[in-house]
């Protein structure tokens, strides 16, 4: 793909976007067939209450656990959706016992193991 800029001008624009916060970070999409295999576990969390106090405490606790890779406040049947990556069921059991079940205000935890990744890291479509 051509952008009509010299490499140095392109790098300068990237640096400016990083400094302005337009580019917040970078992600490596690792092919699980080329690395140690991990399993994505999607976890739906229902809180006892959905008050600002409960939401704030839950979110603060989630941020303290690097095992939790993603966390979304949701509409629908669950309050939050989390993602963790584990090597096996035993590793997930540890996270369930030591992390998920200790999060404040949790009423229900529902976990689903992915079978395989169908689509990840898609860039925003051009319009």
UniProtKB/Swiss-Prot annotation:
Gene Ontology MF, one = sequence-specific DNA binding
- SUPFAM superfamilies in the cross-refs: Dimeric alpha+beta barrel, Winged helix' DNA-binding domain
* Keywords assigned: DNA-binding, Plasmid, Transcription, Transcription regulation
As recorded in UniProt, coiled-coil segments are none
Annotated InterPro entries? AsnC-type_HTH_dom, Dimeric_a/b-barrel, Tscrpt_reg_AsnC-like, Tscrpt_reg_AsnC/Lrp_C, WH-like_DNA-bd_sf, WH_DNA-bd_sf
The segment(s) forming the HTH asnC-type domain are 1-46
Gene Ontology CC: one annotated term = cytosol
Q: Which PANTHER family match?
A: LEUCINE-RESPONSIVE REGULATORY PROTEIN, TRANSCRIPTIONAL REGULATOR AZLB
Protein name per its UniProtKB record: Uncharacterized HTH-type transcriptional regulator y4sM
Q: Lineage of the source organism?
A: Bacteria, Pseudomonadati, Pseudomonadota, Alphaproteobacteria, Hyphomicrobiales
């Amino acid at each position: 793909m051509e952008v009509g800029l010299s490499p140095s001008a392109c790098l300068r624009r990237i640096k400016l976007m990083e400094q302005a916060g337009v580019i917040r970070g970078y992600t490596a999409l690792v092919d699980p067939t080329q690395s140690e295999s991990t399993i994505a576990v999607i976890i739906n969390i229902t809180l006892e209450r959905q008050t600002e106090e409960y939401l704030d405490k839950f979110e603060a606790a989630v941020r303290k656990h690097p095992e939790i890779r993603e966390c979304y406040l949701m509409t629908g049947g669950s309050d939050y959706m989390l993602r963790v990556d584990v090597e096996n069921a035993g590793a997930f059991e540890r996270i369930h016992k030591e992390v998920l079940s200790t999060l404040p205000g949790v009423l229900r935890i529902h976990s689903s193991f992915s079978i395989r990744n169908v689509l990840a890291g898609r860039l925003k479509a051009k319009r």
